[in-house]
Amino acid sequence: MNKGELVHAVTDKAKEQLGESITKKEVDAVISAAIDCIMEVVAEGEKVTLVGFGSFEARERKEREGRNPKTGDKMLIPATKVPAFSAGKMFKDKVAPEKK
């Protein structure tokens, strides 16, 4: 699913839940604003938690040894921060329901 398909799906869900009209343009603006806010907060080193869905945060990736793909020479890859997502319980259960 790409962003356009997500906007379409969210528009349909929102119309169901709100019982009133909402445009794809409005939904696109809200989704874009939410994504921008999440990226800004995580870039500042803070964690964003959406209960049930999951959390976004920046994690430290340690310095490690790697190889130059062109020459095969060993090289040191410096430590860096990377964005990370951890799925919440409700999300995990939706993807892989527990069998009882």
From Swiss-Prot:
Keywords: DNA condensation, DNA-binding. It comes from the Bacteria. GO terms for cellular component: cytosol. The keyword DNA-binding applies. Histone-like DNA-binding protein which is capable of wrapping DNA to stabilize it, and thus to prevent its denaturation under extreme environmental conditions. Belongs to the bacterial histone-like protein family. This is DNA-binding protein HU. It comes from Synechocystis sp. (strain ATCC 27184 / PCC 6803 / Kazusa).
